[in-house]
Amino acid sequence: MRVAIIDYGSGNLRSATKAFERAAREAGIAAEIDLTDRPERVATADRIVLPGVGAYADCRRGLAVVEGMEEALTEAVEKTGRPFFGICVGMQLMSSRGLEKTVTKGFGWIAGDVVGMTPEDPSLKIPQIGWNTLDLKRPHPLFDGIPTGENGLHAYFVHSYHLAAERAEDVVAEAGYGGPVTAFVARDNKAGSQFHPEKSQALGLALISNFLRWKP
């Protein structure tokens, strides 16, 4: 199995690659973790990971300038049905639009816009930086065996925006930060986390292992 982590100049690429390598090794899964900026490698991968940090529009633009990459993503994910995992802004790009600074069109895989967070408690700072627990809204294979809720494992967040999904069934998990914040979405063969699994220690490694086993 070959897992393509897309290198388009954004995301914690080194730490993401190492986290996927470690998760595969510890789970006893034979997987080649392929950090690549080559569309042909993405189009033929068994699983695809899209990291992303920074502004929505910048990440969208960065992906667009890699010739053939968006077409490769569409071929692998939409047409062939390969499992896809978006991380942070990589997850946000799954949305219809991003409303950060300007209106930017997303992939349209998860209906909804990426909007600024507005905590009810004014003492809560934006961005949210740090650890938070997850409220699982519905079962999903990527959370098999992972303790969630107040006494569950913690995930690591760094963000000022979140995906306001139009369909409740697309939201797998939320976090509380002065109100509900979308933490994980999934539809069909596509999944994405607002938090950083590569920085989320036990939760992150378990989530990645489940992704490597996932057969949507």
From Swiss-Prot:
Catalytic activity: 5-[(5-phospho-1-deoxy-D-ribulos-1-ylimino)methylamino]-1-(5-phospho-beta-D-ribosyl)imidazole-4-carboxamide + L-glutamine = D-erythro-1-(imidazol-4-yl)glycerol 3-phosphate + 5-amino-1-(5-phospho-beta-D-ribosyl)imidazole-4-carboxamide + L-glutamate + H(+); L-glutamine + H2O = L-glutamate + NH4(+)
Segments passing through the bilayer: none
Pfam families in the cross-refs: GATase
GO annotations of cellular component type: cytoplasm
UniProtKB keywords: Amino-acid biosynthesis, Cytoplasm, Glutamine amidotransferase, Histidine biosynthesis, Hydrolase, Lyase
Manganese listed as a keyword: no
Identification of the protein by name: Imidazole glycerol phosphate synthase subunit HisH
Gene: hisH
Enzyme Commission number, as recorded: 4.3.2.10, 3.5.1.2
Active site: C88 (nucleophile), H196, E198
Highest taxon in the source lineage: Bacteria
Record function comment: IGPS catalyzes the conversion of PRFAR and glutamine to IGP, AICAR and glutamate. The HisH subunit catalyzes the hydrolysis of glutamine to glutamate and ammonia as part of the synthesis of IGP and AICAR. The resulting ammonia molecule is channeled to the active site of HisF.
One annotated GO molecular function: imidazoleglycerol-phosphate synthase activity
InterPro entries assigned: Class_I_gatase-like, GATASE, Imidazole-glycPsynth_HisH
